[in-house]
Amino acid sequence: MLVLLVRHAQAAEQDAEAFPDDTERPLVPKGRRVQRQMSRLLVKKGLTPDRVYSSPWTRAWQTARILLRETGLPKEQRIRADTLAMPPDVPTIAAEIGEIGPEETIALVGHEPWMSGLAGLLLTGDSALPRMDFPKSAILGIELERLEAGTGTLRCFFVP
């Protein structure tokens, strides 16, 4: 299976007055534009996901919607995954996502520092290794036989 880790696109700046609940910050126009480009790159590279799991936070949910639209997936393939809005724990994420076929590609849309931590867990079994810069709208692909810590191989890393 291929797991695509996607950091949400650029969102509105933190502003307690405009967004008292940080989870409600929406994407800004530049973030939407960059995410469309990154999503089209996946299509060009033949890495279109079969399903997209997303943190429920507005900026991640909107990023997932762009990913679906640009890759031609129906909206039913965007699935809420609350575990993507918290520190990474592979068994918990695996339990929420369920069965993934060996030829399937899934995308997980979330936040920093949790996306780089999840990448570290899947690649090395340690959320602190390798230390990486995971910018907004970046997409990191990891090949796995099963969704288990320390068993992944880096397939791609696209940075806008």
Q: Model-predicted segments: where are they?
A:
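Glycine-rich phosphate-binding loop signature in dinucleotide/nucleotide-binding domains
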Residues: 45-47, 99-104
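Domain-level recognition of soluble alpha/beta enzyme cores
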Residues: 126-153, 159-160
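Short, well-ordered coil/turn elements that cap or connect secondary structure elements
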Residues: 73-75, 103, 149
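Absolute protein N-terminus
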Residues: 1-2, 160
